């Protein structure tokens, strides 16, 4: 890994004085200086320094600035600051959903949600209607016996019903968890069976790419394999009747009932998100009502600069943390856009059309989509009215320099471009958007407030201007409270704290520049990350190796220099098998059916074998490093593998590919 340049270039974009003055983070800094001793001068760098040095005071200020309603007061901000195990706002009780629906009191007839399908015609839902539906469904969940701590699951696309179900679950103190309906049954069960849901919200199918996709057989399999279910709720997106024994959605949201918000401890679970499952079952990551509330208020209200006048559109699905992040836009009183459809239907410019028709002020997408638009010769600034868009944000992978230039040239010059980076693990950003700072090509603007983000070398020494491991040295409120089914905390500890005890190590290569920006170089582990969605290699192995022709397989994901992502599947065939067009088609079909279209590899390549550790584990990271151009002797410890000749094969393959 080479050292990244840190000399600041001329900014691609610089906010003008008026924009800096009216930004929420500027007003917050002035208020915090008056009330909490924050530095009045020095702009964002001084505020960030104060936020990590005076961590408790900073988070107290966030709670006060956003008027967080504690139904019982907290004893102190941070009872225990050790990682893992930080104890935030002990003694406090509150409810996330109550805060998400607060705008209904003052602006009942304004738009809370804009639902957009592949017709690209927005359908509004007011704050009053959203609150009413949440109140009705919450009462029905209580009638079904859902109690605080019970898990409620959704097999749903990005539709208003999913938001209502999440908020109603949070209102009663339940724990929400969701998967997108393009997940196959096995992928869903690997997640939901861990948390044992008592209610399952499902659709009969969904529309994507101009086609209807019937999921009733998958839903039937989920019902059969989830014995803890007390109720299944049918949402007829394709117009089919509810199957036997299922409740109909319309009847559950028909009442005019004021929501009752269960007041739960700050650390009470809000939802379960899932890791990719690279080394087995996905990790079931539990985040708290209070932790998500204050972290998302900070991130969306200060960093993204969202408020009641804004419209927030991020292309996502319910299987990605960005959906949860998107829903939290409601906390700031913002109108949230829910786009349920293909990112490229009927053409590559689809997302820009949605941004235009919804009047989006902050539009978020993947870096891969930006680069696809550039390659497809899309001209969003010419072909769409994007005058409302203040910021285009990207995540999922680092936005390449050409992506910055393309957005600047093809949307407009006065455009805030926010490349952001975080993780499912915290459901937030470690670094990214700051409305008062300049944007430099290829760089994230700065580390987030309250986040002591550093780059460490292997010895644990902080480095500037050099590539190192992304670490966070102080606790964040949205860090997991625990993993599900991890009673001694060992899996949680090993995931983040094994390399540097007491310090969060995330698994990204980064450079922190001497002007405070951040450059992301990609994953330092082998997690697959395609279009912003982290996926597990274990899921792919399980599906592919059911085919009798496949002896073993290996899948690798590589970030390309041009911003692309190459995901080859290497297959070691059974004796007598041939990798012909028929077998390739069956491999692809198996992956599509059992997992999702996103899991389908870019290439399927026959290999003489799959290398392993001495304990029999497939070697992924060394193969990835070989494909990235790392010499064999630096990519792997020769004494730790079962067949060094196999690794020489992959090294030769990499050399051939590079030409």
Explain the meaning of each model-derived region.
Residues 46-50, 97, 113-167, 184-189, ...:
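Conserved AMP-binding/adenylate-forming core of the ANL superfamily
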Residues 109-111, 234, 245-274, 281, ...:
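Conserved pre-ATP/AMP-binding loop-to-beta segment of ANL
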Residues 154, 179-204, 219, 344, ...:
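AMP-binding/adenylate-forming catalytic core of the ANL superfamily
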Residues 157, 199-218, 239, 340-344, ...:
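Adenylate-forming
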Residues 167, 171-251, 358, 366-367:
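Structural core segment of the AMP-binding/adenylate-forming
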Residues 234, 593-618, 631-657:
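AMP-binding/adenylate-forming catalytic domain of the ANL superfamily
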Residues 293-311, 321-361, 376-377:
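Conserved AMP-binding/adenylation subdomain of ANL enzymes
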Residues 302, 339, 390-517, 523-527, ...:
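Conserved AMP-binding/adenylate-forming
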């Amino acid at each position: 890994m080479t050292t990244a340049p840190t000399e600041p270039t001329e900014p691609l974009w610089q906010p003008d004085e008026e924009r800096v003055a009216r930004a929420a983070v500027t007003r917050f800094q002035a208020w915090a200086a008056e009330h909490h001793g924050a530095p009045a001068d020095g702009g964002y760098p001084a505020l960030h320094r104060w936020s990590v040095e005076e961590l408790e005071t900073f988070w107290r200020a966030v709670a006060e600035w956003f008027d967080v309603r504690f139904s019982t007061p907290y004893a102190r901000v941070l009872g225990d600051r050790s990682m893992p195990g930080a104890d935030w706002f002990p003694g406090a009780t509150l409810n996330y959903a109550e805060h998400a629906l607060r705008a209904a009191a003052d602006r009942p007839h304004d738009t809370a949600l804009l639902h957009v399908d592949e017709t690209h015609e927005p359908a509004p839902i007011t704050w009053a209607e959203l609150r009413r539906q949440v109140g009705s469904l919450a009462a029905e969940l209580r009638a079904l016996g859902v109690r605080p701590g019970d898990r409620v699951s959704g097999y749903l696309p990005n539709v208003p019903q999913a938001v209502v179900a999440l908020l109603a679950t949070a209102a009663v103190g339940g724990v929400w968890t969701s998967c997108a309906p393009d997940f196959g049954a096995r992928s869903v069960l690997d997640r939901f069976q861990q948390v044992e849901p008592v209610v399952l919200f499902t659709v009969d199918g969904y529309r994507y790419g101009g086609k209807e996709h019937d999921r009733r057989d998958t839903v039937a399999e989920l019902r059969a394999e989830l014995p803890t279910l007390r109720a299944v709720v049918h949402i007829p997106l394709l117009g089919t009747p509810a199957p036997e024994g299922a409740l109909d959605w319309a009847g559950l949201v028909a009442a005019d009932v004021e929501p009752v918000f269960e007041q739960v401890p700050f650390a009470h679970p809000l939802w379960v998100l899932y890791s990719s499952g690279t080394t087995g079952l996905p990790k079931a990551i539990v985040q708290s009502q209070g932790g998500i509330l204050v972290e998302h208020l900070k991130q969306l209200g200060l960093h993204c600069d969202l408020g009641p006048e804004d419209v927030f559109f991020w292309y996502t699905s319910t299987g990605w943390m960005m959906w949860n992040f998107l829903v939290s836009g409601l906390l700031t009183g913002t109108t949230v856009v829910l786009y349920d459809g293909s990112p490229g239907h009927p053409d590559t410019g689809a997302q820009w059309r949605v941004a235009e028709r919804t009047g989006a002020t902050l539009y978020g997408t993947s870096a891969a989509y930006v680069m696809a638009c550039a390659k497809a010769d899309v001209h969003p600034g010419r072909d769409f009215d994007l005058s409302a868009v203040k910021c285009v944000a990207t995540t999922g992978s680092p936005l390449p320099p050409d992506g910055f230039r393309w957005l600047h040239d093809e949307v407009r010059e006065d455009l805030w471009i926010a490349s952001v980076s975080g993780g499912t693990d915290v459901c937030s950003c470690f670094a990214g958007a700051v409305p008062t700072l300049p944007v430099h090509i290829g760089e994230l603007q700065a580390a987030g407030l309250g986040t002591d983000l550093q780059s460490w070398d292997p010895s644990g020494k902080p480095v500037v201007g050099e590539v190192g491991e992304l670490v966070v040295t102080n606790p964040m409120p949205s860090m997991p409270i625990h993993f599900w089914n991890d009673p001694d905390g060992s899996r949680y500890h090993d995931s983040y704290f094994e390399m540097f005890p007491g310090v969060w190590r995330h698994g990204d290569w980064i450079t922190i520049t001497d002007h405070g920006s951040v450059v992301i170089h990609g994953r330092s582990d082998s997690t697959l990350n395609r279009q912003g969605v982290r996926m597990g290699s274990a899921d792919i192995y399980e599906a592919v190796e059911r085919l009798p022709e496949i002896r073993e397989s290996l899948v690798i994901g590589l970030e390309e220099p041009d911003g692309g992502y190459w995901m080859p599947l290497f297959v070691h065939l059974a004796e007598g098998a041939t990798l012909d067009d028929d077998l390739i088609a069956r491999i692809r079909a198996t992956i599509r059916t059992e997992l999702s279209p996103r899991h389908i590899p870019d290439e399927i390549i026959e290999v003489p074998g799959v290398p392993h550790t001495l304990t029999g584990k497939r070697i992924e990271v060394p193969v990835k490093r070989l494909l990235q151009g790392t010499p064999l002797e630096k990519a792997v410890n020769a004494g730790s593998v079962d067949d060094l000749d196999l690794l020489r094969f992959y090294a030769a393959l990499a050399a051939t590919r590079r030409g």
